[in-house]
Amino acid sequence: MTEQKQVKKPSARRRARECTVQALYSWAVSGNTAEQVELAFVLDQDMDGVDKPYFRKLFRQTIENIETVDFSISPYIDRTFDELDPIETAILRLAVYELRFELDVPYKVVINEAIEVAKVFGADESHKYINGVLDKIAPALGRK
């Protein structure tokens, strides 16, 4: 009898975070407005299993608060935003938005979700970088 590894489907919120990272990436590199990116994303992407209202909230609110989010990140990264991989930037922006504004989400959940998203979309070791940066930011935001 062969054992089959059971693949766990990501939660609706994790899928919302994955979609938010993809949309933030697209917004940053395309030069399109947030509204254009969101509309194109919802029309073009598979949104099955996604907490759509949470996706919309995360995407819109992260962009609405981008200056505050970036200001919270910049002291804790070892390079400029221009030198960061755009996916890492999108993951950090989403996580810092959640750490700063979504206080009902435990900080450990925010950091773990960011790490898991980085494992899916980031370079080989980017999840370690994301973890290190967020471990420094969380206490600075009063979340540890």
UniProtKB/Swiss-Prot annotation:
Similarity comment: family membership: Belongs to the NusB family.
Gene Ontology cellular component list: cytosol
Top-level division of the source organism's lineage: Bacteria
Record flagged with keyword Hydrolase: no
Disulfide links within the chain: none
Source organism phylogeny: Bacteria, Pseudomonadati, Pseudomonadota, Gammaproteobacteria, Pasteurellales
Function: Involved in transcription antitermination. Required for transcription of ribosomal RNA (rRNA) genes. Binds specifically to the boxA antiterminator sequence of the ribosomal RNA (rrn) operons.
InterPro entries: NusB-like_sf, NusB_fam, NusB_RsmB_TIM44
UniProt keywords, alphabetically: RNA-binding, Transcription, Transcription antitermination, Transcription regulation
Family matches, as SUPFAM superfamilies: NusB-like
Single Gene Ontology BP annotation: DNA-templated transcription termination
Molecular function, one GO term: RNA binding
Classification via PANTHER family: ANTITERMINATION NUSB DOMAIN-CONTAINING PROTEIN (PTHR11078:SF3), N UTILIZATION SUBSTANCE PROTEIN B-RELATED (PTHR11078)
Protein name in the entry: Transcription antitermination protein NusB
Matches recorded under CDD domains: Terminator_NusB (cd00619)
